[in-house]
């Protein structure tokens, strides 16, 4: 398979300058030891981080088909470590210590290692200071990729030690076109996928996942049923939503267990513990991503309801559930739809603060039900 068709970097067609810059850096052997990807949410920074990790670990600069490339694309490579803040206030000191303890260890499968640090603006002074020396002079074959919204909200000492890569904001129309080209699906459906999943690459993955699409359908049905729902109905819907969101994790867990089994005979106890910790982080990150995707489904739905209340001919994102949008619009008013959107935003903040997902969704559904009935 040709690299242009298979590599993750080649698929970053909504960020051409970033794609070309990173491709040339890896191919020329001049890749930096530390990058800081800067841009608004939805610009594709995380997609680019995984793409760069794939190219860096591949012995052919990201062929897309070797064992390393396939594992990185599936987010199951033991030498790519993904970190996200584990507390409401940001990164824990324990997370930084774990990362620093891991850096000197030899790679498990590849000849190098990559550390992706998401929401790096949440690296505060007490957690970042220990990381500074390693960022400045990491061991050979180690790459750090930090993701943030703006250099202005980052610690200057972090910014100065990284090569900054700006990402432009991609319009929804351009993103939908990219997904449509990649999948051959209807542009309207692709627009919905980007709105729910957050970026073109994740939109493509969303359209390939029956489980993720089912979670979205269940969220739409849950909100559609709230007008007539009693408390037991709401709690039941919330429970079903959590089950649906976790459904895609079964395949991830199965793959992780197979990798552990394959490596059990020749890896040291420390290396196995390292792999188990990485698997746990990956599952937690995937679950959080699934919850946020479900909440994005709720947000786009209620946005469409609000737009419809203001203009019946409004251009909505969720074309395939216009009946639900119409029923909700008929049952409430602008104030109610606005309060419902605020309930979704509160749930998103609660998840970011590590509130239990089921509790966050239960509270959101009850608040939306109350908001819809305000007329």
Label each residue range with its predicted role:
Residues 1-54, 68-71, 140-142, 149-297, ...:
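Charged, glycine-rich active-site and insertion segments that engage polyanionic ligands
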Residues 116, 145-146:
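Walker B beta-strand of ABC/ABC-like P-loop ATPase nucleotide-binding domains
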Residues 1-126, 130-136:
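Clamp-loader machinery-focused feature within the broader ASCE/P-loop NTPase space
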């Amino acid at each position: 398979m040709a690299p242009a068709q298979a590599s993750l970097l080649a698929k970053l067609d909504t960020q051409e300058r970033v794609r070309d810059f990173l491709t040339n850096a890896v191919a020329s052997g001049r890749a930096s030891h530390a990058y800081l990807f800067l841009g608004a949410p939805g610009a594709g920074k995380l997609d680019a981080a995984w793409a760069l990790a794939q190219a860096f670990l591949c012995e052919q600069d990201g062929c897309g088909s070797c064992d390393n490339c396939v594992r990185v694309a599936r987010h199951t490579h033991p030498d790519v470590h993904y970190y996200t803040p584990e507390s409401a206030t940001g990164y824990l000191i324990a997370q930084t210590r774990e990362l620093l303890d891991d850096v000197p260890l030899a790679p498990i499968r590849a000849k190098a290692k990559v550390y992706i640090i998401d929401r790096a603006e949440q690296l505060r002074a007490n957690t970042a200071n220990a990381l500074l020396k390693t960022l400045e002079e990491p061991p050979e074959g180690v790459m750090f990729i930090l993701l943030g919204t703006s250099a202005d909200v980052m610690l200057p000492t972090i910014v100065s030690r990284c090569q900054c890569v700006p990402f432009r904001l991609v319009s929804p129309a351009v993103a939908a076109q990219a997904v449509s080209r990649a999948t051959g699906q209807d542009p309207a459906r692709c627009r919905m996928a980007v709105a729910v999943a957050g970026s073109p690459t994740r939109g493509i993955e969303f359209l390939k996942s029956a489980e993720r699409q089912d979670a979205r359908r269940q969220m739409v049905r849950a909100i559609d049923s709230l007008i007539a729902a009693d408390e037991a109905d709401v709690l039941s819907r919330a429970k079903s939503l959590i089950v649906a969101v976790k459904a895609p994790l079964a395949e991830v867990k199965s793959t992780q267990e197979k990798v552990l089994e394959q490596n059990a005979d020749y890896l040291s106890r420390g290396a196995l513990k390292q792999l188990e910790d990485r698997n746990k982080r990956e599952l937690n990150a995937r679950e959080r991503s699934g919850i946020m995707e479900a909440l994005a489904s709720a947000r786009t739905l209620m946005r469409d309801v609000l737009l419809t209340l203001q203009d019946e001919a409004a251009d909505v994102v969720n074309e395939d559930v216009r009946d639900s949008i119409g029923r909700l619009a008929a049952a409430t008013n602008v104030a109610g739809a606005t309060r419902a959107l605020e309930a979704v935003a509160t749930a998103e903040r609660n998840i970011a603060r590590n509130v239990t997902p089921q509790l966050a969704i239960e509270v959101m559904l009850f608040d939306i039900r109350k908001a819809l009935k305000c007329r």
